[in-house]
Amino acid sequence: MILVLANSRDLPARRLVETWRAHDARLLTLADLSRAGWRHYVGEVGPEIAIACGELIPAASINGVITRIPWVTPEDLLHVVDGDRHYVAAEISAFLLAWLSQLTCPVINRPTTNGLMGAPHAAEGWMAIAARAGLRLPWTRRVFPAPPEPAWPPEAITVAVLGDRCFGNVDPALADQACRLAAAANVELLAVTFSHAAAGATFLGAQLWPDVSLPELAAALLARFVPAAGRAAANVAEAAA
């Protein structure tokens, strides 16, 4: 079984779960986290139980988890009484941090104390990490309040990184830079945007929400969780070579 921890409105997550239906993939939403029946122990005390799609799931049967929420906010908990939402959001966030950290199966991305998807960074934080990783940076000017969307050029291109693999039609030098950035940020799954696809492009930004429903990336993610899928992917790559 594979769990995708995501908001119920996350369309790429829903598409991924549908693609992986044959592998018993389930969407784990915040509504599931409000249901009775969860069991989590600090240390090896008893059997862990999760709930997804309203069903009790032994933690031992979980082959992997993809996390698509950085933290739980009161706005995520409209099914909770208004006056309790801030408290419940903090409690669920703390519970998820403990639960995800203790799972022995692959968890992408692994949580940190700053975020359930790995360390979140503002635009300036990603620029600093990119500089340390040797990426080429643009001159930037910040205005306040910030615009709702970055003003990127139309030729800008976004690639996805999973471990040491880059998915996207860019120059190999940019693919290598994207992988270096993910390693420097200590995350396994990352979306990286460059000013264009050719060598010499500048780094524009990064975020932890790549479109996981893209076929090539979805296949690589599945190979991380299901050994048979990993062997099949390796055979395809070997045949193509």
Regions found by a protein language model. Give the residues of each.
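Extreme N-terminal starter segment of soluble prokaryotic enzymes
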Residues: 1-3
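Conserved N-proximal alpha/beta basic substrate-recognition cap immediately N-terminal to
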Residues: 7-19, 30-137
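A generic structural motif
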Residues: 21-27
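Short, well-structured beta-strand/strand-turn elements
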Residues: 25, 137-141
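Anionic group-transfer/hydrolysis microenvironments
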Residues: 31, 70, 193-195, 207
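A short local loop/turn or secondary-structure capping micro-motif enriched for an aromatic residue
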Residues: 117, 147-148, 172, 209-214
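Phosphate-binding site of ATP-dependent enzymes
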Residues: 142-201
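C-terminal active-site "lid" helix and adjoining low-complexity regulatory extension at the edge
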Residues: 187, 196-241
